[in-house]
Amino acid sequence: MSRRVLVDSIAYLTKEYKVDGFHFDMMGDHDAESIEKAYLAASALNPNLIMLGEGWVTYAGDENSPVQPADQSWMKNTDTVAVFSDDIRNILKSGYPNEGTPAFITGGKRDINKVFDNIKAQPTNFEADSPGDVIQYIAAHDNLTLFDIIAQSIKKDPIKSENNAVIHRRLRLENLMVLTAQGTSFIHSGQEYARTKQIRDPAYRYPVSEDKVPNKAHLLVDEKGNPFDYPYFIHDSYDFSDAINHFDCTKATDTKSFPENTKTRAFAKGLIALRKTTDAFNFKSKADVDARVTLLTVPGTNNVTQEDLVLRY
């Protein structure tokens, strides 16, 4: 019955409301056959439809009736639905539960070959038989925004212009790596201009007593351990007001007041345009990727070590 509800609902939304994409939160809780049937029903109505989900290994069905879950392990057997790659997320900027730990973009040396494998849509923690199986992302609706996690990781208060510039340069590099990676690139809404979920209410400009700490907030500190000016940043904002969840269009468009934000947005826009003009970042098969995407900074040559902070491909 649950499969019938799932398939019929997806087909109805596709037919009646012309929905052309579906993102399953916790898709690994479902069985693969149900998700596949939902995709086939919807794609019969719209062949250009996209379906993706969180393929974390979370299935908890009847152990006496084993099935293939709709998780990352399914990707070697399907080319219809894609999953998010936590591997590229963790290796480039760190992720739950280790947010704030320095990663490749924030000063933490990483295995160059593993970084490159992820750029090729060949994650090291699950097998994908084609690039289209892999959603290449750094940030999404969960956890801190990319801007905020960079600030946390490098311990630089963005209220200082020189720190803000450093954070933006690292964010632009993250966007560059995601938007030139094989597979399907995904950016969090607002990531293109460096969206933040910092609380800028005067009541929270300085640390408050424990009983007044905002729900689902991280207190960020600089390299000396001093709290940021307005130190609270929300990491789970689905039930917060527009004060946290709004899109600050002024930051995205006002070049005079927000030169770094508008520069970051223009950079992302250019990368998206570049990606659309060529198939060089969107090869269809693993064989094509292996034949045509080459690592130039090979560990052991030109002073590049196995774990390093340099990558050229």
Task: Place the predicted regions along the sequence by residue.
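Generic structural signal for well-ordered alpha-helices
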Residues: 10-14, 35-39, 175, 268
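Active-site-proximal helices and loops of the catalytic beta/alpha 8
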Residues: 26-128, 191-265
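Loop/turn elements at helix/coil->beta-strand transitions in domains of secreted/extracellular proteins
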Residues: 17-21, 46-50, 182-186
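Short acidic catalytic loops
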Residues: 10-29
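Aromatic/hydrophobic pocket-lining residues that form the small-molecule binding cavity
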Residues: 2-6, 35, 171, 264
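Conserved phosphate-coordination/catalytic loops
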Residues: 4, 29, 165-169
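Loop/helix patches that line or flank the sugar-binding groove of alpha-linked glycan CAZymes
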Residues: 131-313
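Aromatic- and acidic-residue-enriched carbohydrate-binding clefts of CAZyme catalytic domains
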Residues: 1-4, 8-16, 240, 244-246
